[in-house]
Design a protein with these regions (language model features):
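Start-transfer (signal-anchor) and selected internal transmembrane alpha helices
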Residues: 1-50, 133
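Short hydrophobic/aromatic helix or loop-helix immediately within or flanking a transmembrane segment
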Residues: 61-105
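Transmembrane-helix motifs of polytopic, lipid-linked glycan transferases
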Residues: 94, 112-135
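Transmembrane-helix signature of polytopic, membrane-embedded enzymes
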Residues: 103-111, 128-150
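Membrane-interface alpha helices of multi-pass inner-membrane proteins
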Residues: 149, 153, 171-175, 183-206
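Short acidic/glycine- and proline-prone juxtamembrane loop motifs at membrane-interface regions
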Residues: 158-165
């Protein structure tokens, strides 16, 4: 991949990430938060140590609903949340140690999940470029990358959900299948099934 292409993807990703923060900051200032549903805010599941910090930052939109489950699994293991596949929270747990996680639901788990999700999506964009470049022109591929980045629901890839990791593994499996490297295609396909249930559908495609 040429340096100019990498710079294009990196700059597009940074702009996308910045734009996603704008409505969060605006909403935090202008809209009233109404707590009550147990999976809508990380502050509701916090210990007292970091709760004041979490309350001052617009964090909860990036880790609510499924995100809370993944962080809980990473910090406490499985309880009654067996519907969430293990690869994503398994990655969060060791990375959180880098941020100094020491207690259950420490904010380090949030930042670890956030870093993994966004890093996986950035890597997915690079693999997406490589995969599409097999069949399409540079202009078509870059247009496709922008379409993926600025699709209305692309914010899921920036949240602490497994979508970004799933996309990365799907693209890696597909790319190596196109290159007829069946060992790596199968390896990433296997990891795909550890991320979401529908990952098993990759094998008939391969």
């Amino acid at each position: 991949m040429q340096r100019k292409t990498f710079a294009f993807i990196a700059l597009s990703f940074i702009i996308w990430r910045f734009l996603l923060f704008i409505p969060v900051f605006v909403a935090e200032k202008k809209l009233d938060y109404r707590p009550g549903y147990e999976y809508t805010s990380i502050t509701d599941a916090r210990n007292s140590k970091d709760k004041s910090i979490a309350d001052k930052l617009p964090l909860f939109p990036w880790a609510n609903f499924d995100g809370l489950h993944y962080i809980t699994i990473a910090s406490n293991g499985y309880t009654n949340n067996y519907g969430f596949f293990p690869l994503f929270p398994t990655l969060i747990s060791p990375v959180s140690k880098i941020f100094g996680a020491s207690e259950n639901f420490d904010l380090a788990y949030f930042f670890s999940g956030f870093l993994i999700s966004n890093s996986a999506f950035f890597l997915a964009l690079l693999v997406f470029y490589k995969l599409l470049s097999i069949d399409y022109s540079d202009k078509q591929v870059k247009t496709s990358i922008l379409a993926l980045l600025f699709f209305p629901t692309s914010f899921f890839f920036g949240s602490i959900y497994s979508e970004s990791l799933f996309l990365l593994l799907l693209l890696l499996s597909s790319y190596f299948a196109r290159k007829k490297n069946w060992l790596l295609a199968s390896f990433f396909g296997a990891l795909l099934t550890l991320t979401r249930f529908v990952g098993i559908c990759i094998f008939p495609v391969l």
